[in-house]
Structure formats: C-alpha cells, structure tokens
Regions:
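A short, flexible beta-alpha/helix-coil linker loop
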Residues: 30-31, 186-188
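ATP-dependent carboxylate-amine ligase catalytic core
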Residues: 36-43, 48-60, 84-175, 187
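Conserved phosphate-binding and hydrolysis motifs of nucleotide-dependent enzymes
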Residues: 67-70, 162
Length: 189
C-alpha cells in the first residue's frame, strides 16, 4: 500500500517498489488494449518517451541483438567480453524470470551484473507518469525507455540491447547501434 503524506495544499503518494511494478504491469497490452486497439503501427510511443527523457538512447554506444533463438546467450556473452575488457557495460534483456529488475543490468566492479535499483524504477516511473498517461505506451515501451535512461545516467561505455518481439516495430529499434547481431531466424511458436 502506498504511503500518503499530507502537507498544506499538497498530497504526496509515495509508491513502493511493488506498487510501481503493479502499475507497470497494467501497461501490458493484454490489460490496456484489446483487438484492433492493441495493434502497434509505429514507434511513436517509444520516440515520445525517449524525447520526454532527453533522448537517452543517443548518449551511449550500443550493440543490438535480434533473432529467434540465442539472443540471451549472445547478449550475456558479449556483456562478459566487454566487461572483461574493462568497459562499463549495460545489458537489456527480456523477459525476466523472477524479478522485473533482471531485465536491466550493468556490469559491476566485482565482476557480476548489478540489477537496476528498486529506487530507480520507482523514481523513473513517478517522473514519467504524466507522459505515460498522455501517450499510453505499452509495458515494453516503458521498460525500454527505462533501460536507456538508466544506461545514460550510469554513463555506460556500451549497452547490449536485446530485441523483444523483434521486427521493425520493436521498441528497441530507436537506437542507432554500432553493431547489429542476428542470431538464427526461424518460425517461432
């Protein structure tokens, strides 16, 4: 349950991490749009979020990974290689297995990957809520923008960005990568 603080003329509702995640999950297309309204014809929502944030996707170098199988493996291998070579490396993958924060990580000094902090997720979501309500982006579009903002704030040397569903309308396509990697492509599901 959110904490509520009342001050003269102001009411502040502070979201918890779980409140924030619950709010983000309401943006999943299955909850927010049905039928023809769920069809995504362009990248306008992702562009709008990135513009609202000052275009964080243009503040770091990236490698874009796409394909039917092996994206996660290739992404993690490249992250390990860049980290071992001394680069501060961001990693964006999907979906997560247990915790939303698994999607957005940065290579740490200890050699492991550090997940995006809960407080960043909360603060980011609160900050862009007006834009979310205005443009009605999907969960994935918000998550992509969050990853880009986190990587820009943390000044990563390079970010490894895995596509979601892939294709020309994948939200990750707003980046201009240094390199694109295509794993095998085949019929899926």
């Amino acid at each position: 349950m959110p904490d509520i603080f009342v001050a003269p003329f102001l009411i502040f509702v502070l979201m918890t991490y779980q409140d924030t995640i619950d709010y983000l999950f309401t943006r999943l297309p299955m909850f927010s749009r049905m039928g023809a309204a769920a069809y995504k014809k362009d990248l306008n929502n992702t562009w709008a979020l990135c513009e609202f944030l000052g275009n964080p996707q243009s503040k770091f170098k990236s490698i874009h990974i796409a394909g039917t199988n092996g994206k996660g493996s290739v992404s993690h291998i490249l992250t390990a290689i860049f980290h071992k070579a001394g680069y501060k490396t961001g990693l964006y993958t999907s979906p997560h297995l247990f915790d939303f924060r698994e999607r957005i990580k940065i290579s740490g000094d200890s050699g492991g990957l550090m997940e995006i902090p809960e407080q960043f997720v909360i603060d980011f979501t609160e900050r862009i809520k007006p834009e979310i309500e205005k443009t009605e982006p999907s969960f994935f579009e918000i998550t992509v923008a969050m990853a880009f903002e986190y990587f820009a704030n943390e000044k990563v040397d390079i970010a490894i960005i895995e596509t979601g569903l892939g294709g020309r309308l994948d939200s990750t396509n707003v980046i201009t990568p240094e390199l694109s990697v295509i794993t095998n492509i085949s019929a899926d599901h």
